[in-house]
């Protein structure tokens, strides 16, 4: 028999591999579905690629690759048979254990046991070889099988990729001298004390000075003033502002010339009024000081105490919590309740799977289709077995109905390369939503882009207070952020009385009084959104100098789906993250037509489109800037010998472009730095005229919109060595967003197809107020229409900070509200409309 098996496997020996240290073995989950060894059909692991496939998908992999040898893993769950001592049998595979296969946490391990079975299966005849079979199998096959069975989870390798290099404790930390000069650092509004830069800022831990970093530090430019200050004063340690969290911060030692650990960081920051001690978390991941005062919020959001009826079937599938992953699960539940996302991924599931790359675990569309099908098929959301069948089933083999799906593979792909999302910490759902939209757009080139439904244009009107002249610009956005004006609370007297009782209870060490929450009218939030905003350090092109400025924002277009974020999270003066505990009467029906932008009004005079002079510093890293500005190409051997202002005919967008060029090309291996004599707001992506910055000429913006990149922008990108056609294609494919265009060019091979096609970027969908669009357009579209909406989704947060707590979402389906709380899905009795964090509205007809 041994010779027969050896001869049988001879043709397949070249395709059987032993996993190496860098290989990922997916033996717990199918690449295309949520099948696992516990599924009825078990899981097939390819012995060449080590990818896992359910019974419905293994044939596709065989046909596509010709790979014939798979290891079939099957886990049986049975009632525990106890021995004389009452102990449990271990999980086993014919006398051996499956390693690194987690137990089903939904099964009580005191009542059930696991029996694991493995065998080799040869396709297409499905010839089976039971394992282990050391005597009859060739040595190489035995070694390969052992390596697969003993392999660790691939997600442990993914977690290791996000680990940072181990840092050492600074030799200056224990005896750091701090000057008692009365300096207290506010939680925002920082500037370099020497050049007014507002990014890449470092706080010196000795004297509290705030100065900018060196060139290319933390992905952005600086003038090196923090290092100069150290050379002058000798103060050794600095912390990067914006990196401070409860777990620490980025600390740099100038003397040791490396990033270091400061074990006394909380003490050193407290010297300057930054209190981190109150931010320390407890073992359960919830801040210690948030539990008692927030109990009421947790109960209301999760509808605790109410008899909620479980929901099952298509669209009512829960998602298991991986540990602080509720920010992701709530967003994805809402996303796949939207028809456009359902059609784009689940509707095209067969095509997406058939054309998936050889490693579908790393393909965005495949994993989106997999998740969408898992949530919408109902396969993983089945009601419990009927009571009369339970006894019969338990006598044979228990087959537990799956409760929710495990999104570990999906999360690993979504968070790849992102420090925060790849961690196990709780995150901001709003930040993940924007991160997700960015991934959708990057992976929708040449295909349907379902994120079009969220995109809208914002018109920003900025007025110089001295000259009274104005500038109208437009930018793309996906979220309407509403401020919370606490001063408009309608129950101020109750709040004052509650605060007094709370203080008395604390001093007397009594239980706190019943919580009183500030009641803020939604109309007040909407009014605050429309209020003029002061623009600090506004550079007026009319005055050719800094001046006071004010900015107002309006909608240049209304999206198909409106996402509204309530800006609840902020920092107190003590640097402790705070969540505004408010109740807002969010409407079920919302009409924002009165917020439609009007464009330049009669009698208004526009500011000249001129930017301040650009200063090229005395730095060898400025060679690329010289080549760009001189138009001499990228191969320049000389450098500027002295810093000098260049009065170039650049508008503000070109100045902003240069800064983005500096940021972006660094990660692709270039060195490029430009110092601007004016600070420009880089918080928003650079959107170049075209789809991204359309100038409306009427209330409905009925001007011709063409996604044609400006020639000067194309020329600047070409000067980096990119072919013109490639630059045009990238800009059109990314809505003229330079940051994404550069990333697109490095991740997509040059393609000449469609490079010279010009198409529109607005889809009105039979809207008489919109603009006719070319159906073959490449760039993202603006789906304009009326501004009347109906609420259909709510993401709520329980806790005091986005760094902790828990997210729950409520979605309106089939006329009723449903609560999605991790793997639990139930009919909602009291959706917490007044306590939500992110609200989702869909457009309704007038």
From Swiss-Prot:
Catalytic activity: Thiol-dependent hydrolysis of ester, thioester, amide, peptide and isopeptide bonds formed by the C-terminal Gly of ubiquitin (a 76-residue protein attached to proteins as an intracellular targeting signal)
Keywords of the record: Autophagy, Hydrolase, Metal-binding, Protease, Repeat, Thiol protease, Ubl conjugation pathway, Zinc, Zinc-finger
Gene3D superfamilies in the record: Cysteine proteinases, DNA helicase RuvA subunit, C-terminal domain, Zinc/RING finger domain, C3HC4 (zinc finger)
SMART domains given in the database record: UBA (SM00165), ZnF_UBP (SM00290)
Modes of activity regulation: Specifically inhibited by spautin-1 (specific and potent autophagy inhibitor-1), a derivative of MBCQ that binds to usp13 and inhibits deubiquitinase activity.
The UniProt record lists the keyword Acetylation: no
SUPFAM superfamilies the UniProt entry points to: Cysteine proteinases (SSF54001), RING/U-box (SSF57850)
Binding site for Zn(2+): 192, 195, 212, 225
EC number: 3.4.19.12
First-tier enzyme category under EC: hydrolase
Record domain USP: where: 317-844
Residue ranges of every copy of the UBA domain listed in the record: 633-676, 708-748
Zn finger intervals (UBP-type): 168-276
Function: Deubiquitinase that mediates deubiquitination of target proteins and is involved in various processes such as autophagy and endoplasmic reticulum-associated degradation (ERAD).
Domain notes: The UBP-type zinc finger has lost its ability to bind ubiquitin and usp13 is not activated by unanchored ubiquitin. The UBA domains mediate binding to ubiquitin.
Protein name in UniProt: Ubiquitin carboxyl-terminal hydrolase 13
Organism per entry: Xenopus tropicalis (Western clawed frog)
Gene expressing this chain: usp13
